[in-house]
From Swiss-Prot:
This is Deoxyuridine 5'-triphosphate nucleotidohydrolase. It comes from Xanthomonas euvesicatoria pv. vesicatoria (strain 85-10) (Xanthomonas campestris pv. vesicatoria). Its EC number is 3.6.1.23. This enzyme is involved in nucleotide metabolism: it produces dUMP, the immediate precursor of thymidine nucleotides and it decreases the intracellular concentration of dUTP so that uracil cannot be incorporated into DNA. Belongs to the dUTPase family. It holds the Pfam family dUTPase. GO terms for biological process: dUMP biosynthetic process; dUTP catabolic process. The gene is dut.
């Protein structure tokens, strides 16, 4: 696998990293995200409908205001077990330096146990474009216009 093109400052908040658990890393050459682990002291069971903030065991500092990080669910956990993020997506601003917490929600029908070290989410770094607002009275017409939910149909 080719080496990363940029570096990310990471604080290890859990001593099990490097010993019991590897650092977050890209699993394949084309992976967009690095898996985040549940830095729990003991197994945690989420009953259907329960939500919990789970520590990732790391803190990051992007420093570059043209970047952000997002915490996203792992597709298999959501599809097979109903384990998703309680906040949909976790947005991490470039100047945030605190611990990464994973809002985890069991939207499934069965209890699900998360073990210490389980990979429960993924971290993706994205570019940011900051826009200035231009107040207008009307927009130039577009093909879609103001068509909202369901506007383009399903077929």
């Amino acid at each position: 696998m080719s080496p990363p093109t940029q570096s990310l400052q990471v604080k290890l908040l859990d001593p099990r990293f490097g010993d019991l658990w590897p650092l977050p890393a890209y699993a394949t050459e084309s992976s967009a995200g690095m898996d985040l682990r549940a830095a729990l002291e003991a197994p945690m069971t989420l009953q259907p409908g329960d939500a919990a903030l789970i520590p990732s065991g790391i803190a990051i500092h992007l420093a570059d205001p043209q970047l952000c990080a997002v915490i996203l669910p792992r597709s298999g956990l959501g599809h097979r077990h109903g384990i998703v993020l309680g906040n949909g997506t976790g947005l991490i601003d470039a100047d945030y330096q605190g611990p990464l917490l994973i809002s985890t929600w069991n939207r499934g029908r069965e209890a699900f146990t998360i073990e210490p070290g389980d990979r429960i989410a993924q971290l993706v770094i994205l570019p940011i474009v900051r826009m200035g607002l231009q107040v207008v009275d009307t927009f130039v017409d577009s093909a879609r216009g103001a068509g909202g939910f369901g506007h383009t149909g399903v077929r």
